[in-house]
């Protein structure tokens, strides 16, 4: 293990993880696999008694704390970007919750999956800004889609993917089978199989407000501006009363 290898590992981590600590595929399974890869790298460093063995400790903790938030009240994960619940039990069991001395407070999300949680409710909101980078090659056409669970039951969901390989996950990526908003049965994102988006909203904007009674998520995108002269906006008003 030399400085070049360590530098490359840092480069990969910096380019694949967003500032909140989420893998830029915005797929919980891929996120979990990346955490496991970092843990394996640390184990290799420790085996060779490398002084850089703890270099990814902060990132592992950051990513694990985000993963800890990605569960609905029924124990399932949100089905964004081809996720599925085949490995949910393994993902949940991999979390060592004893590492968290206090609950992490997440700063405002400006790009990614925004979420709200209380004792009985969980809300996820897709405000990911698609791009042409290869890291986006698994993103679905689900801008402004949402998931909601409450009192142990999933209420709104996305299509996800029934398996990890084959044509079905790819088909579902570019279908409109997401809880998003469309005009005249047209999709805002053009996706080619096994590639990043060809056409996508150039601007996805997210705003979050809080008051004593409500948490407000508001997202918008310009994917229909050129063809329909419309800005699409979705506003979620969440009652913060735990019993509602």
Where are these regions (language model features)?
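Active-site lining segments of carbohydrate-active enzymes
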Residues: 1-27
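Short, charged, low-hydrophobicity "junction" segments
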Residues: 11, 95-101, 191-194
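Residue-level preference for alpha-helix termini and adjacent loops
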Residues: 16, 22, 76-79, 170, ...
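Carbohydrate-active enzyme catalytic cores, enriched for enzymes
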Residues: 18-159, 211
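Non-catalytic C-terminal accessory modules of carbohydrate-active enzymes
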Residues: 104-244
């Amino acid at each position: 293990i030399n400085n070049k290898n360590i530098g490359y590992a840092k480069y990969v981590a910096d380019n694949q993880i967003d500032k909140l600590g989420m893998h830029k595929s915005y797929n919980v399974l891929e996120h979990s696999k990346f955490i496991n890869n970092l843990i394996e790298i640390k184990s290799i460093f420790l085996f060779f008694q490398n002084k850089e063995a703890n270099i990814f400790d902060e990132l592992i903790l950051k990513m694990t704390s985000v993963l800890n938030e990605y569960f609905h009240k029924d124990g399932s994960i949100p089905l964004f970007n081809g996720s599925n619940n085949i490995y949910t039990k393994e993902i949940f069991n991999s979390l060592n919750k004893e590492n968290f001395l206090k609950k992490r407070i997440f700063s405002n999300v400006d790009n990614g999956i925004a979420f709200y949680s209380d004792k009985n409710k969980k809300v996820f909101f897709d405000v990911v800004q698609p791009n042409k980078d290869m890291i986006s090659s698994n993103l679905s056409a689900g801008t402004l889609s949402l998931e909601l669970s409450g009192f142990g039951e999933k209420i709104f969901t996305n299509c996800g993917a029934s398996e990890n390989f084959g044509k079905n996950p790819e088909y579902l990526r570019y279908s409109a089978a997401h809880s998003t908003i469309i005009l005249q049965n047209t999709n805002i994102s053009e996706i080619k199989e096994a590639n990043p988006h060809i056409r996508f909203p150039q601007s996805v904007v997210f705003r979050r407000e809080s008051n004593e009674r409500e948490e407000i998520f508001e997202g918008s995108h310009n994917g229909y501006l050129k063809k329909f002269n419309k800005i699409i906006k979705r506003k979620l008003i969440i009652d913060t009363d735990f019993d509602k």
